[in-house]
């Protein structure tokens, strides 16, 4: 009888909720909810700081965001622009192509922009952003070839840890950026912040051209004539790879047909002593785009410029950028594509 009474009391205690039992069951739930709440608050605060103070980021990040969020989303062309030219590439293009000087080499009606990105050789993301904003070019100039990668699969995207991380936590580098900003500002925070803003606005006003003076090796912004580094190959020509098949190539062809623009691969720039001079253009270079009527390759792989035209080992200074832009304008004019 006593055993049955004990079992009955136990069953009754299980069926009837009590304060003590509720607290025991709810403890894990409350802990999880508390963690999620605190994590959400921290995320909101850090994201607010990241958004409110964009000029504390490195110059490359500021330029990248400004080109995607401000430049290509604005109205780039007018009805008077008969030839609308967008130039793509990496940081060498960012520092090397001066749109206003390029346009001045032609009759009125040519309008160009520098869409070179720092530390990023991708073509499609910023081209698609420009097209989505209604900025349709007549000519797309590529200073670097497309890659040979196939179309990314869902598994490829899931393996891209860095992209996923930056999507979920865009302020991942905020602590590093704050420390770097304090170190470079010498505690002149307002002046340093305003300087970054002015550099961004200057880049936008110059239609995407940006002198990367923060990486210059000498105060003058020029390298000495005998400058060289161990990785140079002054007697070797390293031809750039121009794949005949790739996802980017297929997308460029699809977009060129849909929007009616031409895609042209043009020469890049190379510092003297870094590599040997590139041979003149020949018919073999056009084999890769032989099946694409709206695409062509003109000029050599690159042009050679003296070290004095470079601010660091790879990026042109303003004088070098003017030289490269002049050569590019001459090549484009001789090709007849803007006639």
Question: Residue ranges of each PLM-predicted region?
Answer:
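N-terminal Lys/Arg-rich, disordered targeting/topogenic segments
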Residues: 1-30
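Second-shell loop/turn segments in exported
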Residues: 87-89, 113-117, 235-243, 270-276, ...
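Membrane-embedded segments
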Residues: 88, 92-174
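Secreted/periplasmic serine-hydrolase-like ester/acetyl group-modifying domain
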Residues: 155-259
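Substrate-gating cap/lid alpha-helix
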Residues: 256-259, 264-298
């Amino acid at each position: 009888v006593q055993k049955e009474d004990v079992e009955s009391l136990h069953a009754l205690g299980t069926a009837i909720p009590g304060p003590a039992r509720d607290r025991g069951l709810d403890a894990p739930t409350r802990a999880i909810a508390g963690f999620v709440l605190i994590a959400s608050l921290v995320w909101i605060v850090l994201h607010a700081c990241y958004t409110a103070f964009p000029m504390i980021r490195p110059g490359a990040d500021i330029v990248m965001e400004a080109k995607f969020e401000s430049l290509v989303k604005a109205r780039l062309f007018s009805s008077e622009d008969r030839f609308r030219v967008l130039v793509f590439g990496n940081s060498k293009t960012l520092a090397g192509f001066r749109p206003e000087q390029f346009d001045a080499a032609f009759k009125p009606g040519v309008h160009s922009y520098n869409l070179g990105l720092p530390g990023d050789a991708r073509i499609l993301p910023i081209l698609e952003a420009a097209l989505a904003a209604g900025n349709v070019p007549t000519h797309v100039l590529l200073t670097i070839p497309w890659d040979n990668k196939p179309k990314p699969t869902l598994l490829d995207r899931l393996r891209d840890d860095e992209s996923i991380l930056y999507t979920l936590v865009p302020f991942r580098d905020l602590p590093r950026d704050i420390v770097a900003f304090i170190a470079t500002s010498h505690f002149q925070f307002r002046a340093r912040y305003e300087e970054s803003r002015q550099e961004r606005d200057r880049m936008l006003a110059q239609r995407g051209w940006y002198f990367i003076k923060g990486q210059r090796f000498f105060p003058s912004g020029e390298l000495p004539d005998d400058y060289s580094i161990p990785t140079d190959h002054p007697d070797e020509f390293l031809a750039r790879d121009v794949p005949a098949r790739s996802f980017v190539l297929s997308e460029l062809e699809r977009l060129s047909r849909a929007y009616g623009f031409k895609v042209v691969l043009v020469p890049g720039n190379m510092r003297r002593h870094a590599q040997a001079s590139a041979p003149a253009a020949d018919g073999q270079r056009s084999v890769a785009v032989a099946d694409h009527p709206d695409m062509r390759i003109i000029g050599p792989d690159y042009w050679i410029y003296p070290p004095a035209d470079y601010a660091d080992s790879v990026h042109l200074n303003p004088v070098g950028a003017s030289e490269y832009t002049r050569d590019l304008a001459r090549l484009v004019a001789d090709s007849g594509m803007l006639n």
